[in-house]
Amino acid sequence: MFLQAVTSPISINSLMVLAAYVLLGGLYLIVVPLLLYSWMNRRWHCMGKFERLSAYGMVFLFFPGLILFAPFLNLRLNGQGEV
């Protein structure tokens, strides 16, 4: 009985659960952090206080995904140029 259960093909419910995990993980680790990087890069100097507070909250919430992309993205602000 146990051998038959182990060797049987994966049920459709298991595949649906696995697909849901992959989808949610991809959203959490890839899609939302990239959108958050883009949004913060465009709006950094013109954010209001509540928008900045929500940005900090989103950074806290999506920190694992942001830290994955941090070594590859260079979003430094232009600054003052040569000093």
From Swiss-Prot:
GO terms for molecular function: oxidoreductase activity, acting on NAD(P)H, quinone or similar compound as acceptor; quinone binding. It is a multi-pass membrane protein. The chain crosses the membrane at residues 15-35, 53-73. It is found in: Cellular thylakoid membrane. InterPro entries: NADH-quinone_OxRdatse_su_L. It catalyses: a plastoquinone + NADH + (n+1) H(+)(in) = a plastoquinol + NAD(+) + n H(+)(out); a plastoquinone + NADPH + (n+1) H(+)(in) = a plastoquinol + NADP(+) + n H(+)(out). It is an enzyme of class 7 (translocase). One of its GO terms (cellular component) is plasma membrane-derived thylakoid membrane. Keywords: Membrane, NAD, NADP, Plastoquinone, Quinone, Thylakoid, Translocase, Transmembrane, Transmembrane helix, Transport. The keyword NAD applies. Its EC number is 7.1.1.-. NDH-1 can be composed of about 15 different subunits; different subcomplexes with different compositions have been identified which probably have different functions. Belongs to the complex I NdhL subunit family. NDH-1 shuttles electrons from an unknown electron donor, via FMN and iron-sulfur (Fe-S) centers, to quinones in the respiratory and/or the photosynthetic chain. The immediate electron acceptor for the enzyme in this species is believed to be plastoquinone. Couples the redox reaction to proton translocation, and thus conserves the redox energy in a proton gradient. Cyanobacterial NDH-1 also plays a role in inorganic carbon-concentration. This is NAD(P)H-quinone oxidoreductase subunit L.
